[in-house]
Structures are given as C-alpha cells and as structure tokens.
Amino acid sequence: MNLLDGKICIITGGGRGIGYTTAVKFAEEGAKVVIAEFDEKTGQKAADDVGGFFIQTNVADKFSVNSLFEKVMTEYGCVDVLVNNAGILMDGTLVKMEEDQFDAVINVNLKGVYLCGRGAATIMKEQGNGVILNASSVVAHNGNYGQTNYVATKAGVIGMTKVWARELGKDGIRVNAIAPGFITTEMIAQMPEKIIKMMREKVPVKRWGEPEDVANAYCFLASDEASYISGMVLNVDGGVVV
C-alpha cells in the first residue's frame, strides 16, 4: 500500500524486538528508515536488512541525540516520523531497587523520549508537519509488581504525549502513544513456561501479541490515514485494559 512512501522515519531502539519489526514494516510501506540504536552490531544489521541508515545513538545523552538529528538532516533534509521506541528494564521491588537502577531506567525510558521528542519537534515545527509516536505500556494504566521505575517512565510517557499533542498540534505535528500488552519477544521467551501460561490466561483473546501487531499500529498512526488522530494512547493488548 506504500502508506509511508518516501517518509523519513527515525526509530530509536530499532535494532531488535518491536523496534526492529517496526523498521521492517515501515520499509515495506515505502519509508526511508533511520535506525537509532545504541548497540552498533544490531543497529547496523537492522539498517542493512531494511535498506536504511544506521546512526549509533545513546538516547539518554543530549549530545548523542543532537548528533542524531544533525546527521539525519544532513542526509535527508527533513524528519517526517519519530518512533520513540528505545527502552530498558531493571526490575526490583521498591525496597530492593537501588537508586542507580531507578535512574538508569528513567534516563533511557523517560529522559530519552524527552530528548528525542524535543529534537524532532524542533525540526518538525520548521517544516510545518510531522508525527511523533511514543512507546508506553499497558502497565502504565494498572501498575506491575517489581517495576516502580519502568511503570513510572511509561506513565510519564503518556503524560508527555498528551502535553505535546496540545502544544504541537498548531504546528501540524501529531503526537500519539502505543501501549503494548504481552508481546512475544526475546525477553519474554526467557521466562518460565508456568509464568508464561499464567500471564497468557489474563489476556481475553487468549494469546500474546506479536511484534507485528505493534508495528502495524505504529504504521497506521504514522501514516496520513491517521491524520485526525492526536493525543491518543492506543492499547495493543488483546483486551487486557478495557
């Protein structure tokens, strides 16, 4: 369908998992994909796979983020879509979570979204158009045991998404968030089968989502088909949050 034909799309954390699958989907729909990934090996491979452009990026570092956008503008001259996908986990219950664990997740999952969003919005305001898509999670709605830092970031992402939608709409910029539920990833595959089965039973459609389910949602929201949608949080969760 070429929903994203010719659009310059930056995907942070695009080297693996949902980010990688989203990069593949965007490329299939005609986008020129920029993989902004901290890990050089996975990032370069992803870019090669989708015929894209790899830029090693630490989303928690403002100088690295500034360099990302400078390189994209030098290469392409515009930014049409930013997918703020990069994120990490460092779980632990409240009394056992160390301060450095808390800070590390906040820096990547929340500050990183802010830095990349600011960089993209600055360019998009001058263009008069653009789309910013932020990765949240269904745990932002109901919390999750042992994830004080992670849940705080994903709830914060929803808040920022709504603020940015209000601030940037007049500049032709749409801002939305995706909140995935239980999605089959490498991280999930390492969990005990008993836990996997128990968690699957909590999903009304009785299956876990695939990365493609999330990628399809990102693609729709990035496209002109969603031109009147902004400030929305789309749950891709099989009905867990209703």
Named regions from a protein language model:
Residues 93-94, 98-106, 188, 199:
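Substrate-binding pocket helix/loop in short-chain dehydrogenase/reductase
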Residues 114, 129, 207-236, 241:
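C-terminal substrate-recognition "lid" of short-chain dehydrogenase/reductases
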Residues 8, 15-17:
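Conserved glycine-rich cofactor-binding loop
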Residues 40-41, 57-67, 99, 212-213:
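The beta1-alpha1 cofactor-binding region of Rossmann-like NAD(H)/NADP(H)-dependent oxidoreductases
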Residues 117, 153, 161:
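Active-site helix of classical SDR
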Residues 122, 166-170, 227:
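Alpha-helical segment proximal to the catalytic Tyr-Lys
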Residues 137:
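Residue(s) in the substrate-gating loop at a strand-loop-helix junction
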